[in-house]
């Protein structure tokens, strides 16, 4: 194969994620949807809350930050509520990834990728 002078690699440009961050004060438990921001800063507002992930969709991900001002926890669960995946304490965040969807006959394709301590400023 001869070299034709064209670069065989395409260098990707920076990817922007408009609407990718959302901060919310919860008044009760929260069920996520696929049109929610992928990065969510949630304040429990005085009481621990349950967060139900969106219906499984292969390749979906969400990063949830517990931005509560006191020791209040977020319990993150599968979309069908069957399994708790993580408890995110104050000043922690959880990164979740979905590797299955309804086509795979899965109601619980979400996985915890990382539980990360954060510093809020």
Regions found by a protein language model. Give the residues of each.
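Short edge-strand/loop segments of extracellular domains
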Residues: 78-85
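Cytosolic nucleotide-binding catalytic cores of signal-transduction proteins
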Residues: 96
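Exposed extracellular interaction/assembly regions and N-terminal maturation sites
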Residues: 1-76, 104-121
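Tight coil/turn sites that cap or link beta-strands
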Residues: 37, 89-93
């Amino acid at each position: 194969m001869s070299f034709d002078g064209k670069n065989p690699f395409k260098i990707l440009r920076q990817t922007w994620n408009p609407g990718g961050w959302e901060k919310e004060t919860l008044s009760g438990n929260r069920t996520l949807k696929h049109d929610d921001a992928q990065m969510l800063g949630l304040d429990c507002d005085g009481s621990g809350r349950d967060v139900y992930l969106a219906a499984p969709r292969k390749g979906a991900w969400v990063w949830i930050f517990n931005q509560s001002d006191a020791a209040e926890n977020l319990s993150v669960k599968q979309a069908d509520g069957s399994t708790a995946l993580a408890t995110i304490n104050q000043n922690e965040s959880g990164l979740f990834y979905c590797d299955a969807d309804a086509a795979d006959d899965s109601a619980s394709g979400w996985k915890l990728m990382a539980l990360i301590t954060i510093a809020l400023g």
